[in-house]
Each structure stands twice: as C-alpha cells, then as structure tokens.
C-alpha cells in the first residue's frame, strides 16, 4: 500500500469514527427540550397544570461536516413522541413552576456516505426543569422568564450501536445542563413576539471510538448558544399563526485521538451550527384544549444532518 493509500485509509477510518461518535454521544434527532413554541412565555395562574404531548417527525437527506462539506448518500428518519408535564406555582409574588419532559421513539434509515448507522428505538435522557418570571406585567403584555434544565444520563444507550436515543433530546449522551432566558411582548390586540437565548453545558463522556472497535476515547463538547424567535398574529381569540427562526452556534465536539500527535491530538466529530425556519398554526378547540401544527426546514447546517423537512403536532390540555 502506498503512502497516499495509507493516508486515504486513515482519513476514511477517522471520518467513519467521527460520524459514529456523533451518533453515539452527540445526538442526531429533531427534538430539543428548550425549543419554544409561540406564546410559551406567558405564565398561567398559580396552581395550573398543563399536559403537553408532541409527535415529531424529521426527514434528514444530507450530512455536513464541521467544515461545511456535504457527504452524499446520507439520510436519517426520525419519529418521536414527547410527553411534557408543567406545573405553575408562584414563588412570592413571582410566577414560577416546574416541568418534566420525557422523549421516546425511533431513529431509522441512518447512513452517512453509504455507510449504515442502523436504527434504534428507546427513550431519551429525562429533562428536569424549573422556571421563574422575575418580571411579568400583564397590563403591558411583557413577560421575562428564566429557566434551567438538567439532563441526567438515564436514557437508552448501547455502546455497541451507532444510534442511541439517550442524546436525542439534550444533544449529548452524558450530563447536560441548560440556562434559558425568554421574553414575550404583545403589541396591540393581534401581534406578539417571543424571543429567547439559551446556553448549554456538556459533561465529558468516555466510550468506544466505534461500536465495533473496543478502543475507548474521551469525548468532549463545547458549550453552545441558541437563539429563537417567533412572530405571532392572533386572527381570533382561538386561532393564531406564527413564523419563526431557530439558530445554533458553537458546540464543537471532538474526541482525544490516540493515534494522532502521540495521543494528544483531537478529531472533530460535530458542531451545533444550524439555522432553521419554522411556521406554526394553533387553535383552541375549547378553553382547556389546544392543537398546534408546525413545519420546519434547515436552511444551513454544519457538523451534522441537515433536516429537509420537520413536522410537529402538539396537543395541550390545561387543568
């Protein structure tokens, strides 16, 4: 084998290992616990409970490296259910509450560059969350909320598989934390907007470089930042439509490469660079029950699968 062939073979191995590690510890899903829907930042009265169920579908038809290179013959289909329970309880004079989120479902048809990632079914790491409104002014239709999320690594994980559901909600297989700040502003009787920023923190993990190679490496993911925006128009008291944006920045992930620079090198495995357009319509069928339908599409991606089409169907029940 020539030097060029050896280099090409090594590069191919590292690419396959990087992609496998993205799937193994980084998550390839269409769901995120801190992903907001329109008017979520308006607090409910103290003592209110809300049960929310989501069906989420994602069709991913291309994969992009961290340098922006498109890898052809790549795909992933995602079908998930997400159960979310929210309880509101004032803290002093400030609205506040707690929530728990549990995602389950399947990822199938996974492949990158023609190499199969297989399929998986299971549950994601549970999301535990608390939130509070340090400022809420119903007279001015202004609301400022701060929320925290914690993801203990309790989801479905098998180091022998490329795809694992454990990371599908938090974006990481190991311990993950998130701090989110959100603002809702109503302007006139019909228009409102929601804006949020959040930063995620990820704990290091260890695991095989590939499911079929028992070589353990340390995996690291830098913190990432996400920005979200919804512009909402209420056509009636019950029916609203919205257009939105979601963007991820940073979040580079890598593993310590044992065969590069004497074990001191790094191999990039992914990033949280993504820009998504969203559109939603919601309808209250009764004062307690709401339906929401959302469609979305990634307009740019780096360090993961690019979602060609995403669908969200949400039911919300207030009691």
Regions found by a protein language model. Give the residues of each.
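Outer-membrane beta-barrel biogenesis signature
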Residues: 28-52, 60
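Outer membrane beta-barrel transmembrane domains
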Residues: 64, 70, 207-208, 214-319
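Residues that define the transmembrane beta-barrel architecture of outer-membrane proteins
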Residues: 47, 75-81, 120-126, 142, ...
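Transmembrane beta-strands of outer-membrane beta-barrel pores
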Residues: 55-61, 102-108, 134, 150-156, ...
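Residues on the lipid-exposed face of transmembrane beta-strands in outer-membrane beta-barrel proteins
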Residues: 53, 82-87, 128-134, 148, ...
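Short loop/turn motifs that connect adjacent beta-strands in outer-membrane beta-barrel proteins
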Residues: 39-47, 88-97, 135-144, 187-191, ...
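Outer-membrane pore/translocation modules
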Residues: 105-220, 269
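Transmembrane beta-strands of outer-membrane beta-barrel proteins
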Residues: 49-51, 96-100, 128, 142-148, ...
């Amino acid at each position: 084998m020539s030097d060029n062939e050896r280099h090409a073979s090594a590069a191919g191995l590292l690419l396959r290992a990087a992609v496998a590690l993205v799937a193994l510890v980084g998550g390839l899903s269409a769901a995120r616990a801190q992903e907001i829907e329109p008017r979520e930042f308006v607090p409910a009265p103290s003592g209110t409970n809300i049960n929310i169920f989501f069906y989420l579908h994602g069709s991913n038809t291309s994969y992009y490296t961290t340098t922006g290179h498109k890898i052809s013959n790549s795909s992933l289909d995602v079908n998930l259910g997400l159960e979310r329970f929210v309880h509101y309880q004032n803290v002093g004079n400030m609205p506040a509450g707690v929530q728990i989120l549990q995602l389950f479902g399947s990822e199938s048809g996974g492949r990158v560059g023609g190499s199969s990632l297989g399929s998986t079914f299971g549950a994601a790491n549970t999301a535990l969350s608390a939130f509070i409104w340090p400022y809420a002014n119903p007279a001015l239709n202004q609301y400022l909320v701060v929320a925290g999320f914690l993801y203990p690594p309790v989801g479905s994980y098998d180091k022998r598989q490329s795809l694992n559901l454990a990371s599908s909600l938090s974006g990481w297989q190991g311990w993950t934390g998130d701090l989110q700040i959100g603002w809702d502003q109503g302007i006139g009787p019909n228009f409102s907007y929601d804006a949020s920023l959040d930063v995620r923190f990820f704990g290091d993990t260890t695991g095989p470089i590939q499911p079929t190679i028992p070589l353990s490496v340390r995996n690291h993911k830098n913190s990432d930042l996400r920005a979200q925006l919804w512009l909402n128009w209420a056509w009636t008291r019950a029916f609203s439509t919205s257009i939105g944006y979601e963007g991820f920045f940073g979040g580079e992930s890598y593993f310590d490469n044992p065969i590069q620079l004497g074990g001191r090198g790094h191999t990039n495995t992914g990033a949280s660079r993504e820009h998504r357009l969203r559109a939603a319509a919601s309808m209250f069928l009764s004062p307690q029950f709401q339906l929401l339908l959302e469609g979305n599409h990634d307009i740019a991606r780096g360090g993961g699968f690019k979602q060609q089409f995403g669908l969200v169907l949400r039911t919300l029940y207030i009691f």
